[in-house]
Structure formats: structure tokens, C-alpha cells
Amino acid sequence: VSVVALGRGAQQQVMNQTSELGTNTLDTFPGKDFGDTRAAAIETLVAADAQALAEQPYVDSATPNVSVSVTALYRENAAMAQVTGVGFEHFRVKGLRLASGRFFDQRDVDLHAQVAVIDQKAATALFPGNPSPLGEVVMLGEMPVEIVGVLRPAQNSFGGSTPTFFVPYTAAATRLVGKYHLDSTTLRIKDEVPAEIALKAATSLLTERHGTKDFFVWNSDQIRQAITRTSTTLTLLVSAIAMIALLVGGIGVMNIMLVSVTERTRE
């Protein structure tokens, strides 16, 4: 019973961590699939697509995404960092929470504001011993940004180890990336809407906007389903092992009792 309980507890822990990844989301990428060599040449996925998706009745929130790797520099501390340009709704889409400071808002996006929300890895790498980096200015490549928020530490182990800066996508596009088309969009589906229905509707909308299907949509709920199947299988395996161990232990006890009875009968 204890072994089975441990297995189920581990399964629940994995599912709780998975839920923090924002599994009720749809990601749209240019190209036919991951690894499409022609995806880099497709420039039709734009911020207006994310806005159009955000206005749909099945969507809770949506964000455009552009990313680039740069050297982050603060005084004598430097680190390779991932700069992700996003909309102000990104933090709602992903279910991220603050440890301190604030998220940037629509006004920051409209003004191409050079502000950033950082994760704990960035805070540790660039501000060792500084419990409050708010208001500090970091150089991201050639762009200075002011730190306005620090995210809470992630409770899951699925993230990478690279320090991450979230900045308004408008600032990233004009001052870092030098392009106006997107790497991807991400939308959060309303809780009461089935993911498959939302996927079909989003695909139809973007196909109509682009005039062709030059993108693919990734349903991140597939991750949750795969992890659920795997953890269920592991729980069943642990239960089977526990039953076998119990059976073997019972046979051992029976043998000992039989030997004891035989000896007493002989006496």
C-alpha cells in the first residue's frame, strides 16, 4: 500500500509541475513542422495575427514571440542570455508569477519601452548577492534595459538553464532582432473550450489571413497527455512490483511456518 501511495504521489507531483508549463496553450510556428528548413524564409506570421487570435471567443489571452540570444552585461558580470520579446499578456498565457516588481503593460509595448522582466537564473547570474535588482540597467547586446520585475522560481524541472529576459516584442523587434515577423505566437485557451476545437478554429483563422497554410499549430496539451500516459504506466509498474514483492514475501513466510510446524510435529 505504501509503495502504491508513493507511486501515485509521484504521479501527482509530476502533473502539478506539468500544469505550470501552460499546457492549455496553442503555439503557432512558420513552416510545415519542426525542422522545416524553409521556415526561416516565411515572414507571414506577424503581431496582427496574435491580436486577431486574442479577439476570438475561445481564447483567454495571446502573445506574439520573438527570440534572440545575446550577451547580458551588468557591471563586471556577463552571461549568455535568451531575450524573448513578448506581448504584455505573455505572463498570463504562461501562468507566470512575480517574486518582486511588476510586469510590463500595453503602454510599455506601444512605446517600445526598454524594460525587462527576468527569471531567477538571470537574477542569480548577473546580480549575485543582490536581493533586489529592480531598477538596475543591464546591457542586452547593444540595448540597455531597466529591470522592472523578477519572476518567482519555477517549480518544475522542464526549463533550461539559460538566463531569460522578457521584453516588449516591439523593443526586441526594432532594437535587437531587426525584423517585424514573428518566431511564433502563443494563445491560452479558455478552460471550458476543448483544445481540439480551438486548434481547428485557430488554424482556419490563420489560413484565411495568410491565404495559405504556411504554418503549423502545436497543441501543448499533447505534452500533458504523454506525461499522463507515462506516469500512469509507471504507477502500474510500481504497483505490479509491489504485488510481486508481497507474493514472494508471503511464500517466504509460508515456508518458514511450514518448517516450524514440521519441526514441532517431529518433536
Show where each model-derived region lies.
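Mid-to-C-terminal secondary-structure elements
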Residues: 88-104, 108, 113-211
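Helix-terminus/capping and membrane-interface signal
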Residues: 1-23, 233-237, 241-249
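Intracellular coupling helices
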Residues: 242, 251-267
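Conserved ABC ATPase nucleotide-binding domain "signature" region
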Residues: 113, 222, 248, 262-266
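Residue-level detector of beta-strand face positions
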Residues: 71, 135-139, 216
